[in-house]
UniProtKB/Swiss-Prot annotation:
Compartments, as annotated in UniProt: Cell membrane
Function: Produces ATP from ADP in the presence of a proton gradient across the membrane. The catalytic sites are hosted primarily by the beta subunits.
The protein's name: ATP synthase subunit beta
Native source organism of the sequence: Lactobacillus helveticus (strain DPC 4571)
Gene that this polypeptide is encoded by: atpD
Cross-referenced InterPro entries: AAA+_ATPase (IPR003593), ATP-synt_VA_C (IPR055190), ATP_synth_F1_bsu (IPR005722), ATPase_a/bsu_AS (IPR020003), ATPase_alpha/beta_chains (IPR050053), ATPase_F1/V1/A1_a/bsu_N (IPR004100), ATPase_F1/V1/A1_a/bsu_N_sf (IPR036121), ATPase_F1/V1/A1_a/bsu_nucl-bd (IPR000194)
Length: 479
């Protein structure tokens, strides 16, 4: 193995010179800087500058590094432990356990984090809907098993809360293997999630990988690949259906932009790296379903300053099967989850996939909400009195639909004190159909807010002293 020395340290970027007469390490190879007998730092080769000098990115803090320190080539890319033993464990970007448990032996099976995407002929598609138990998602932007989903939203609109609720609902119902990857997010949230999953018994079927906010950009750039490598092993070698949660995919792009200028690349739009689309494509094309198994991925995507035209979120859009857009104006109204029902979309909202009844109810919901959206300008200027009776009815039903799209989450119970609810798709469709058909016109709006199935609305209305006059609603209440 060839040996070189550090010639320059620029923050997280290190230049290393190797003898020209020996084989230079390949791009993406891992290099090791020996700081002391027990301590070393891993670098990854990114650019060859010429004259035997390689520009590398550090995966750990570069404190204490200086010119002249010896660097050795490991002979290959960063490789991480894979297999059943990774379940129930927490790793960093290098595949080292950070949960206080035993380390993995050197002869344990390992895989490189850099791989080619599966070949075109090996791919497969699924038309099976993945039930989440969240009404707004199941009705208007259903997720496909083996598909890619993006949760888009600005700061503090509830992306991580929805991801945690999906982990709670799907991982427990799904019963299969899950991989959670924390990319550049808060360490506290990762810590909370770990103990929550441990308490609920899901941890034994979950591998967790973290490269959080305090990590150098190199770790945040590569940690998504580490999590994906674990998921790929379960898909390709064990033939499993895997759930891959990534929070937050924007931080992967952000880390790349942090080091892009230091690597000598010319910045592109808004200061992002010119290789943004390529890097995103290389990651996303590996997250797919093959004939051996599937990876269903749910990715949170931070939207800087709520601007969806920003290159980072807009590059991510192209790779997704379904998008769940979170809207700040709904947060301000206290509607949680704050999912925008008109902006969110899914390729699976098709009568051939979800069925005729589901499709019709979903399009009717979108139509009534769109009509309400159009009437809001008139209402804000002239008031409700200027609307026709038909328009007043549309507004009343639309507001009930909007409130009924909200629900309480299991993971938020410790903050709200209200138990969460899991609503099956059939119950969701039944509830919205009753509202749209006018069976619940005489119930107060507030009875629809933050409830589970439609039966909860009727009970809440009864507690408010209102009994429905409609025979169908009465029959439901008597049940």
């Amino acid at each position: 193995m060839s040996e070189g020395e550090i010639v320059q340290v620029i923050g997280p970027v290190i230049d290393v010179k190797f003898p020209i007469d020996k084989n230079l390490p390949n791009i993406n190879n891992a290099l090791r800087v020996i700081k002391s007998e027990n301590e070393s730092i891993v670098l990854e080769v990114t650019v060859e500058l010429g004259d035997g000098v390689l520009r590398t990115i550090a995966m750990e803090s570069t404190d204490g590094l200086r010119r002249g320190m010896k660097v050795e080539d490991t002979g290959g890319p960063i490789s991480v432990p894979v297999g059943e033993d990774t379940l129930g464990r927490v790793f960093n970007v290098l595949g080292q356990p950070i949960d206080g448990g035993p380390a993995f032996s050197k002869d344990h099976p390992r895989e490189s984090i850099h791989k080619e995407a599966p070949k075109y002929e090996d791919l497969t598609t699924s038309r099976e809907i993945l039930e989440t138990g969240i009404k707004v998602i199941d009705l208007l932007e259903p997720y496909v098993r083996g598909g890619k989903v993006g949760l888009f939203g600005g700061a503090g609109v509830g992306k991580t809360t929805i991801i945690q609720e999906l982990i709670h609902n799907i991982a427990q119902e799904h019963g299969g293997i899950s991989v959670f990857t924390g990319v550049g997010e808060r360490t506290r949230e990762g810590n909370d999630l770990y103990f929550e999953m441990k308490a609920s018994g899901v941890l034994s079927k979950t591998a967790m990988v973290f490269g959080q906010m305090n990590e150098p950009p190199g770790a945040r750039m590569r940690v998504a690949l580490t999590g994906l490598t674990l998921a790929e092993y379960f898909r390709d070698v064990e033939g499993q259906d895997v759930l891959l949660f990534i929070d937050n995919i924007f931080r992967f792009t952000q880390a790349g932009s942090e080091v892009s200028a230091l690597l000598g690349r010319m910045p592109s739009a808004v200061g992002y790296q010119p290789t943004l689309a390529t890097e995103m494509g290389q990651l996303q094309e590996r997250i797919t379903s093959t004939k051996k198994g599937s990876i269903t991925s749910i990715q949170a995507v931070y939207v800087p300053a709520d601007d969806y035209t920003d290159p980072a979120p807009s590059t991510t859009f192209a790779h997704l099967d379904a998008t769940t857009n979170l809207e700040r104006s709904l947060v301000e109204q206290g509607i949680y989850p704050a999912v925008d029902p008109l902006e969110s979309s899914s390729s699976a909202l098709d009568p051939e996939v979800v069925g005729k009844e589901h499709y019709e109810v979903a399009t009717r919901v979108q139509h009534v909400l769109q009509r309400y959206h159009e009437l809001q300008d008139i209402i804000s200027v002239l008031g409700m009195d200027e609307l026709s009776d038909e328009e007043k009815l549309i507004v009343a039903r639309a507001r009930k639909v909007q409130f009924f799209l909200s629900q309480n989450f299991f993971v938020a119970e410790q903050f709200t004190g209200v138990p969460g609810s899991y609503v099956p798709i059939k119950e969701t469709i039944k509830g919205f159909k009753l509202i749209l058909d006018g069976h619940l016109d005489d119930l107060p709006e507030d009875s629809f807010r933050g409830v589970g199935p439609i039966e909860d609305v009727l009970k809440k209305a009864q507690e408010m002293g209102v009994t429905p006059s409609d025979p169908e609603a009465k029959a439901l209440l008597e049940k």
